Amino acid sequence: MLKTLKQMSIPFSGNEYEIENLSKLDDKMLAAMKVSLPNQTALYDAIKGDLNKDGIEDVVVVAQETFNEKFMPFSDGCDESTKDDKWCQIVNKNRRGVVVLLSNGDKYEAAVTKRDIFESPNEDGGAYFPPELAVEIKNSELKFFYSYGKYGYWEYVFALYGKDFKLVRYFSSDNNGPMLEYIVQMDFINHRLDKSANLLYQGNEEYKRYEECIEKYRSFDDAQEEDDYDAIFIRKTYELKTQKILLSEVKKVDYIDGRWLDDLQNSKQLGKILKIDFWSEYLGDNEDELVRCVAGKI
């Protein structure tokens, strides 16, 4: 099939795993994809799965444009003296796009085409590597997953909505190494937003608000090292007023401009608090005392 890509003058990139995925595209898929993207586009990855529940595999193609002006050094601050440095190699920084091809009888049709919804895979992560994107089809849902190593991960989940795709769930986990700080879950079907804050993480607002209770809890066992405490979360459930977010209308799903959905946490789209509760994987007697103390101060 890679031979077919070359015969159709369709460039491709990606690593060995992604190129193997591209090799599984058939002629019908390639023909539908080619009319949806400009000529200056290389295929980057392909994911198969049944999105419209007709029993036939659909395909999501990740592509990357190849405009010359976006070929530049990997890092900023490179010059003639550093051109041979591995961080100054010329890479493709064109943004990546996605084409969702749905089966329709004996052919495929592009349901949604977004030419630049993702950042390039060659962004400079500074002192840490940049988040890594994975696209997945599971249970007829389209998922965009970002892994950021010790800093956490986040995921957007879309489902077919007419001829478009609607955001149905969002999940993010903010970590500081092994310590969880925040977990955010958005349910756009039931219009709920859950935000869990780790009461034992000193950097967040909930710790500062209930510091007296937390320090009392920690004094129960002076022999236990501070870093050994399990996470204990206070979870606040809000009404989420947002009606629908369509994939065709989303401009960017990446990390360069921040996790754009996190803005909903501090916007007018949030309604009243519906519930406050606590959870932990290992909630023991001392943790119960902490929960009672915090609950008494809410």
Segments from the language model and where they lie:
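Residue-level detector of high-confidence beta-strand sites
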Residues: 62, 111-113, 170
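Acidic, small-residue rich beta-repeat scaffolds with periodic aromatic anchors
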Residues: 1-14, 125-298
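Blade-edge motifs of beta-propeller repeat domains
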Residues: 1-39, 106-129, 246, 262, ...
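Acidic/hydrophobic-patterned starts of short beta strands in beta-sheet-rich repeat architectures
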Residues: 51-64, 136-146
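Short beta-turn/strand-loop junction motif enriched in small, turn-promoting residues
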Residues: 48, 65-68
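A short catalytic or substrate-binding loop motif that flags glycine-/basic-rich loops and adjacent residues
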Residues: 39-40, 53, 91-92, 149
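Primarily EF-hand calcium-binding motifs
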Residues: 41-46
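Beta-propeller blade repeat segments, especially FG-GAP/WD-type strand-to-loop junctions
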Residues: 2-4, 8-11, 68-115, 158-161
